[in-house]
Amino acid sequence: EALKIGGFTTGLFKNGIPTLIGLYLFCSGATIDVKAAGETVYKGVLLTALKFFGGFGIGLLLNAIFGEAGFLGLLPLAVIGAVTNSNGVIYATLAGEYGDESDVGATAILTLNDGPFFTMIALGTAGIGKFPITAIMASIIPLIIGFIIGNLDHEWRETLSTAMALLPPFNGFCLGAGMSFFTIAGAGFSGILLGLLTVAVTGILTFIIYSLIRRKADPMGAAIGTVAGVAATTPAAIADADPSFAPQVETSSAQIAAATIVTAIVTPLLVAFLARWSRKFNEKHGLGNAKQQNTGVKAMMAETE
């Protein structure tokens, strides 16, 4: 109640989610470099596509089987909102540890899955939600403007990329102010389940697909098996565009918040394990250069059978 006194206090700590999400998207867009090298863009686009279709596919499947009630309390809004959105900070850290410069550079492309844009596309395509074109455009325009400014002025890019780290705590505060303790406690099991589902679909499964496409075992395919903290604000943004989702916002947000913590713990451990396994696998089968790629595909297929 203390946060409802109005003015700047209410605006920042209670009703600030739309503004903070827009600012986060603006900063994210500024980090995308139009001059990025081909390998960086290739990896970034591929990982973004795998993340989106993984979340879209599992969300569509669960909705078709269990309907709006969800699977073991997991709502379709929470599943799609979480699984399609990766934690860029964790990915960048893992890329710096187990990848190369192009993997680190792909982080900027992965920022495209920040915010509600892909979730709206997935829910709308699946027929689960109805979003006016203006709402869809409004969810991506801040990122586009940030992209333009970041590429016109590199100093602004550096400033805005640094500012991204300041925003998640404020997002979390606004989000928590709209939840009850019982909702958070009740999301415990389903939130853990959502986190493990995210790791399974966009961690383990994407590692296999990414490695087959790359024609060598590549642990970075599993590094997108996370849920970004900002994803917890996606249900509120979705409900603003389609009020029919309003009853699901509180529960979905709590589930996504719990999944964020689970994936932040599990995914780095998974990537560390897969990095060791991949190194041994690639050395065993002589992978790593173009002349050996076809052999590598056959070897990976044989290893997984």
Task: Mark where each language-model region is.
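Hydrophobic alpha-helical transmembrane segments in multi-pass integral membrane proteins
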Residues: 57-64, 119-128, 174-188, 231-253
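Entry/N-cap segments of selected transmembrane alpha helices
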Residues: 11-17, 30-64, 115, 179-210, ...
